[in-house]
Amino acid sequence: MKEKSCGCIILKDNTVLLIGAKDDAGKLFWSFPKGYQENGETDIETAIRETKEETNLDVKIIDDESITTGHLIHGGTAYKEILLFIAKPLNGEIKIQEDEVEKAKWVKINEASKYFDGYYSDVWKKLLDRLKYLKIDAS
């Protein structure tokens, strides 16, 4: 079984927006705003909608090519594919969706990988490579 989730890696002034949520055991983990597609949505439409729902931010996708990762879920019985699109905020103040998100914060891009304990570690290499390709400074 395969599931798909789409979201945004939001960049602003050499920082990235991380959201904190709790796992089934109640432990806080860091991630990006993302969620499941609704009927008929494209991957990018899902990413923009989920970002708005979870953070109240309107975003502009700055790269149509997703950074893709994934992991096993449901006790290893399904694979969750995660497509993340690089975006920038257009307007809005962060207001978290309290039933899904515990907190949100801007973190320097070059310090953000320490928030993941191996989870999303592949995303950071892909993100830095992509930023270099797009000529976006991540220092």
Residue ranges and their predicted role:
Residues Q37-I61, T68-V123:
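Unchanged
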Residues N14-I19, Q37-I44, V59-E65, L127-L131, ...:
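Short low-complexity stretches enriched in small and charged residues
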Residues K114, G118-S139:
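Charged phosphate-binding loop/patch that engages nucleotide di/tri-phosphates or the phosphate backbone
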